[in-house]
């Protein structure tokens, strides 16, 4: 068990800043800056003796914050900012004085940490929507100019919790602890900083649920020595096996955190005795392949529980966490959780995003393994030093990490997540399609803004609507800048398509009537053939499809000609022969179904056939056959455009075909996904296919940067049309996907 620690500088009279700095083994310039800052803070407090009853506590807070951040290997600027933060929070100095003495960078960092207090305005503890709270946390990360502000604030909250009993009244303490539980602990988890996350969680649990906390702590303490001896023996045995096969490996017992134990008990509905990971061991290796070597050794030497295995190396958690988790049975059949990770994975899990700002001066230890990983960050920071008063570098850094998102508020304070560059119309359509259709204006912070205004982080938008929907076609033009997201434009297009139906029906009817007049056909003759072909309910649907261009008129006419017009006597004779052959097809068909189980061609057994590549039909599709020159019969979808052209030219070569009952071969088909261009789109698509056990045979993609659209074509292997419909439906539900269809 790891017990949370209280404030440890209990004898401030004995505290000597110079000795303390020496103990941290800091670079000379960093040490000097911290000493100057400490004396600066002390002198300010001494200047207000009546108001500063908690002066000692404030100085102590600054020192503890520095210690926490130093353990995270934070840089000198971060440490100096932490030392000064208590006097800034208590308004003992002004910004000009700070800027003059400590510089613009430190002043900007201090302002950023203070901005973190705005989280209280969000009142996240009253939100019942988990997604809403998560958006608030993500917005908090993106709002600040420098990630170090977030980490400093987390350190400040930990120092508060360590001494909360002496800092404020009970009611204020409970509110502050809830704030840490709802906002700051999940924030530390999102940043991947395990060292801060577990301490925040355990403190919050101790204050909010003291009885449960004490009960678990007591259970852990009762058999602590026996458990420690058991783990020590297991570690010794396991280390021997591992060192025979892995050059560099470290094995040790892993400390348990009370909150994580309680959470697992609640989640899995277990008693304390039923937990697997009260006894836990961690294996640290240097190379990725050694993780799986170690896993093989562990599973070979000890019986493992398959249901308790998780590979977060191959499938990292959303915050980047990587490790292999497994549970094995040690001596006496006692379960032991084993975690396996590389040193870099371990450092990432403990330091998370703080690793990007690690303090390097005078440090040549194991942290040098991070050099390759953060080289690009160093270049950005060096570039920042060369540019005066420029926020472009940090903006680029934020976009790399947070996928170019902007988080804005509704009038009720709800957070809406949109791509950077979104406009008020994008916001309106994100709320609801009808809000977008009826939008006639927008206010940001009470001020009217144009539709081309690009939303900024933290904007509060009020949409002005009219009674009836009336979107403009100009909104669809990306060059005009009214809309930015593909989803907004798709909703606008859908509205116009629906509204245009009244215009398309008479236009389509006129086009079809003109063509039928040339063929001496009536609409009554055409209706029984045309409606089933396109799966339509009535003639208005047919006219609307022709008028909008969704139904190609020339294809329809070719189809109708093949069904209703016999051009020559020779063709008529051939048609009669085909009908005669069809009369004897039933017995032959039954035989084919039993013996072939594939495609059954009317009246012919065991005839060579192949699937046409132009339309790639699969079981469930309506199909027809076409007699080729020397290659047997090619099987097409009944609505295949290429087949319709062939049929119009040589109708005598067409033979009716159906699927056999036992056709089990895999079919190759092409699908297309059109979506708003975003990071992780291809990963999400392939995940859906993998979950359905669909093989991907080929992928090609292209992007339209102006329209922010991505088009992905894929060749996949399927067995029937039902599974295709299921796949397309799941793909269509993915975020930002506009269309998923078969080609």
UniProtKB/Swiss-Prot annotation:
Q: Which residues form the HD domain?
A: 58-161
Signal peptide extent: none
Q: List the disulfide bonds.
A: none
Can you provide one Gene Ontology molecular function annotated for this UniProt record?
guanosine-3',5'-bis(diphosphate) 3'-diphosphatase activity
Q: Which domain of life is it from?
A: Bacteria
Q: Which SUPFAM superfamilies match?
A: ACT-like, HD-domain/PDEase-like, Nucleotidyltransferase, TGS-like
* Main enzyme class: transferase
Query: For this protein, what reaction is catalysed?
Result: GTP + ATP = guanosine 3'-diphosphate 5'-triphosphate + AMP
Keyword match Methyltransferase: no
The pathway is: Purine metabolism; ppGpp biosynthesis; ppGpp from GTP: step 1/2
InterPro entries according to UniProt? ACT-like_dom_sf, ACT_dom, Beta-grasp_dom_sf, HD_domain, NT_sf, RelA/Spo_fam, RelA/SpoT_AH_RIS, RelA_SpoT
The protein's matches in NCBIfam families, at most eight in alphabetical order, are given as: PRK10872.1 (NF008124), spoT_relA (TIGR00691)
What PANTHER family has UniProt attached to this entry? GTP PYROPHOSPHOKINASE, GUANOSINE-3',5'-BIS DIPHOSPHATE 3'-PYROPHOSPHOHYDROLASE
Family statement drawn from the similarity comment of this UniProt entry: Belongs to the RelA/SpoT family.
Q: What is this protein called?
A: GTP pyrophosphokinase
The protein's organism comes out as Haemophilus influenzae (strain ATCC 51907 / DSM 11121 / KW20 / Rd)
Write the lineage as a comma-separated list.
Answer: Bacteria, Pseudomonadati, Pseudomonadota, Gammaproteobacteria, Pasteurellales
- Recorded name of the encoding gene: relA
